[in-house]
């Protein structure tokens, strides 16, 4: 169930360079946790690092759903001092059910919050992917002079950035993202493996009706056994109340 998908931990870009792979500079090293087997997560940030036998870094990436709109996923990679470079590399490899327009061989430099990506001409969809992915890092405000607002045409009306598809989640489920819907409202429905509703409600983003706003909400739920499930987000048509702009995020629900 990969119809389309969508969610972010404080990480910063570190200095680096390279001629055959993306390079990053003018940024401090990424933060790490200090307790073995404990993963640190925080709403509103973009990367998670875990200290264990082998350290890893969780990146927030953006690919293209079948309808050509952006979808957010998370991916664990080996711990690195250049997470921005790792992000560009990972953007060339789309998960099943999605596509990417980001070419390989890109170079990255960062100066005072401005990221500059060179090495190949970025088509509009690729630029949108790169802008959204790199601006999850708090040290990056724009890419090649473009902000998220400049590439918003590639974002769906409701973009869930957390949780990611196929995440194993427990109650309460924390959901974050951004939206541009009529009067800033939309609905959600959390379903179990049988499609039975576990929770449903409406959400109000910080802005809407032509302006993209952010949202964050929590869903308490209860299941007896681990099972597949799904989070559905959608808007009700102002004309006839029908479901429009629906996105489905497959999840693994655990007690």
Give the role of each language-model region:
Residues 2-12, 17-255:
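Bimodal "functional hotspot" detector
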């Amino acid at each position: 169930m990969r119809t389309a998908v969508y969610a972010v931990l404080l990480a910063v870009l570190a200095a680096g360079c390279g001629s055959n792979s993306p390079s990053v500079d003018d940024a401090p090293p990424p933060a790490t946790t200090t307790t073995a087997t404990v993963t640190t997560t925080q709403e509103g940030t973009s990367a998670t690092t875990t200290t264990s036998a082998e350290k890893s870094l969780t990146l927030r990436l953006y690919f293209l759903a079948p309808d050509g709109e952006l979808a957010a996923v998370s991916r664990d990679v080996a711990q690195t001092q250049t997470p921005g470079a790792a992000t560009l590399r990972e953007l060339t490899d789309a998960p099943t059910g999605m596509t990417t327009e980001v070419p390989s061989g890109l170079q990255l430099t960062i100066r005072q919050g401005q990221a500059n990506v060179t090495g190949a001409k970025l088509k509009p969809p690729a630029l949108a992917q790169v802008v959204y992915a790199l601006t999850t890092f708090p040290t990056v405000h724009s890419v090649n002079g473009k902000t998220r607002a400049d590439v918003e045409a590639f974002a769906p009306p409701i973009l869930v950035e957390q949780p990611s598809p196929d995440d194993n989640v427990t109650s309460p489920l924390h959901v974050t993202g951004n939206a541009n819907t009529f009067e800033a409202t939309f609905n959600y429905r959390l379903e179990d493996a049988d499609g039975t509703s576990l929770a449903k409600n409406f959400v109000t983003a910080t802005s809407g009706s032509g302006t993209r706003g952010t949202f964050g909400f929590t869903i308490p739920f209860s299941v007896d056994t681990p099972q597949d499930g799904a989070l559905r987000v959608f808007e009700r048509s102002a004309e006839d109340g029908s479901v429009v702009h629906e996105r489905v995020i497959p999840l693994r629900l655990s007690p």
